[in-house]
Amino acid sequence: MASSITPRVVPAKPAGDETFDSAAYARRIIRDARTAALATTDSETGFPFLSSITTSTNRKGKVLFLTSLVASHSRNMRHDARVAVMFQIDESDEEWAAKRPMFQGRLTLSGKAHVTDDATDIEDFLKAHKKLTIAVKQDGFAIWKLDPMGVDMMAGPRLAPELSIEHLSSN
């Protein structure tokens, strides 16, 4: 059962409500996020490279994201498919999160990304981002699919469960 690719130094113990469904919360973060941070390894220097991406999920809950093929992160992923994607959703209207941005849910998936030309994936991405239809249909853009290999979720001191990739599959 794979958890984080980068194990925590100190194991995190779940805090707060024992009935809280952290797996469902993780799936919600991924599904509701419209953008995310993408970490790749620069193909020329080997240094980490971080950028923003537009995200959605397909019908199976797999992460999809759009990039311009001339962007640095696209070049990097063609050279080394290993990536990390960090999702965060705005929960500032929740009483427990008000004025505490680090209490809000954030989740990092580590894995490998590949360009998908599956018609269903493209349809699912465009359903979430209708205004990007023209960009997607141009040759200079691609939709990528993430094959996750590790997951790490933090939501401040109230919640930091150990999750596995298997937890992200909905029943």
Task: Give, region by region, the residue ranges found by the protein language model.
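Short, structured beta-strand-loop surface elements
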Residues: V9-A12, S72-K131, Q138-F141, P148-G150
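Solvent-exposed, well-ordered amphipathic alpha-helical segments
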Residues: R31-A36, D118, K145, N171
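C-terminal edge-of-domain segments
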Residues: M1-A23, A128, L132-N171
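Well-ordered beta-strand positions in beta-sheet-rich domains
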Residues: L50-S52, R106-S110, E162
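Surface loops and adjacent helix of pleckstrin homology
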Residues: T41, S68, Q88, G156-R158
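Residue-level recognition of conserved structural "scaffold" positions that shape functional pockets
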Residues: I53, D118, L163-I165
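An N-terminal domain-cap segment
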Residues: S3-S4, V9-R78
